[in-house]
């Protein structure tokens, strides 16, 4: 008793110190139904993106979709259930106007992040085509991203050569498929990434797409602080 033994109860609490705000800009043009990924480009992306979202517990995420125009699917939120539900509901025909407006998709994403006070602001922009629609030039949108301190990772999605893609509509409303050349403006995507301090990736199949999102996940790590508390229980009791 004179030695006054102590019993230590040690507990740990993790406190998030610096979260990241991430907007995923997704091309939803009809070509995203091409079957060079399984079962098609869009569904392959949704599966990989869902895993990515689940791996970011400390960050806020948002979704933007674009084809000939763009709009916000979900604003920045820490509610992963909401983001995953919105991701699952994305279809090629949610935006009626056809085409691929990369500049619009990027500009809308910048708009979602410009007021953010996060220590790191990131856009992951994915497309399977070339910029052929919209009234905002992709380079102008890139300059806006730089102005607001936003890094852009770009992903070109699609195999090399020809891909089985929608070429018309049948009377029953289903797409007719045919072999179509894969055309991705890689030079533009590389320029966007380089201008904003990000990286460009090319995904030619499902596994490569998964590897790319894993790589971005490693590059953009959330910083956390760990606090340890020690509670002492005095073994000695005075008489």
Stretches with model-predicted labels:
Residues 1-12, 222-239:
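C-terminal signal-anchor/stop-transfer transmembrane helix together with its immediate cytosolic
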Residues 4-120, 136:
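Membrane-embedded segments
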Residues 20, 58, 148-151, 196-198:
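Short glycine-/polar-rich loops that comprise or flank the Walker A/P-loop
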Residues 24, 64, 124-125, 151-156, ...:
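Structural recognition of the beta-strand scaffold that forms the well-ordered cores
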Residues 30-31, 68-72, 129-132, 158-162, ...:
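Solvent-exposed loop/turn segments at secondary-structure junctions
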Residues 79-82, 170-173, 218-221:
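Short, hinge-like loop/turn segments at secondary-structure boundaries
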Residues 96-100, 122, 129-195:
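VWA/integrin I-like adhesion module and closely mimicked acidic/polar interface patches used
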Residues 189-220:
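Extended, hydrophilic extramembrane loops/domains of integral membrane proteins
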